[in-house]
């Protein structure tokens, strides 16, 4: 397939248009530009300030808060409220019927983990427009699952989607890997890719890797994913490995707990917006802490408290079993029951 990408100003939406010339299928990615001066009180100067701050389209403005817009020089609270309200009207944000929501969920696609058992408890695989958390002790398989997801994104057989949107997803999909612990290994990506008959270097070329040494860098990289999308990259997978390690080392003690949780909440909100607006899969890995007072139930719990608990769509706890076997327990989901699955981690990657 030959792909043409046309750029018209700022990148907002990717509308695939298909045509056939001499039996070749062409996908024209038409990009529609939002004119910010359509918003009340926004002239060319204010529009430029909004773009410089990253608010390049109506949807991003519609999902912003008044406080965020007032950080831009020259925008008052009253003006920010007016701008946001107008953007929401243009984006048709508001109440929808249950049937409309059900129809919209047809755009959701799923990415296989590599294990049929694990896919089954997830309802078919890693779901787009969602944040999936994998928590567990060291060596439980969190980073391996993240690496495998990057490889599987380049394997059409491991993507489950309606025909109407599958071509969009398969149009040179790319992954973003935010590495906070220095555990990303390109050699492992190559090894997993070759096990599936893929070109390891080609898979690596479709992964954007960023090493975050503190929470500010981590949050900035997540926010900058939109810049990659605006540059024309078809980002369909975002990974943060791991979510809470930088926050734990920077905010020590109960005195800084509230500040840490607020910041972590903002980070999770960014990841949720990416998943929802751009229809991508978001994976976060998470560390655990011991529960010395636990008489019943698990002796470890995921870091992040209620902030992460409420923000993550699917929560899975991983633990070691015998040899190369691992056990995954789905313990939180909006629509799936609690369930366990066993999978293996070998040289070939994740499988049953």
UniProtKB/Swiss-Prot annotation:
Gene Ontology BP term (one): DNA repair
TM annotation in the entry: none
| Example of a GO MF term | ATP-dependent DNA damage sensor activity
Keywords in alphabetical order: ATP-binding, DNA damage, DNA recombination, DNA-binding, Nucleotide-binding
| Entries under Gene3D superfamilies matching the protein | 5' to 3' exonuclease, C-terminal subdomain, P-loop containing nucleotide triphosphate hydrolases
Query: What are the coiled-coil residue ranges?
Result: none
CDD domains per the record?
Answer: archRadA
Q: Where does ATP bind?
A: 136-143
What Pfam families does the record point to?
HHH_5 (PF14520), Rad51 (PF08423)
PANTHER family this protein is in? MEIOTIC RECOMBINATION PROTEIN DMC1_LIM15 HOMOLOG (PTHR22942:SF30), RECA/RAD51/RADA DNA STRAND-PAIRING FAMILY MEMBER (PTHR22942)
Family statement drawn from the similarity comment of this UniProt entry: Belongs to the eukaryotic RecA-like protein family.
Role this protein plays:
Involved in DNA repair and in homologous recombination. Binds and assemble on single-stranded DNA to form a nucleoprotein filament. Hydrolyzes ATP in a ssDNA-dependent manner and promotes DNA strand exchange between homologous DNA molecules.
Q: What's this protein's name?
A: DNA repair and recombination protein RadA
Native organism: Methanocaldococcus jannaschii (strain ATCC 43067 / DSM 2661 / JAL-1 / JCM 10045 / NBRC 100440) (Methanococcus jannaschii)
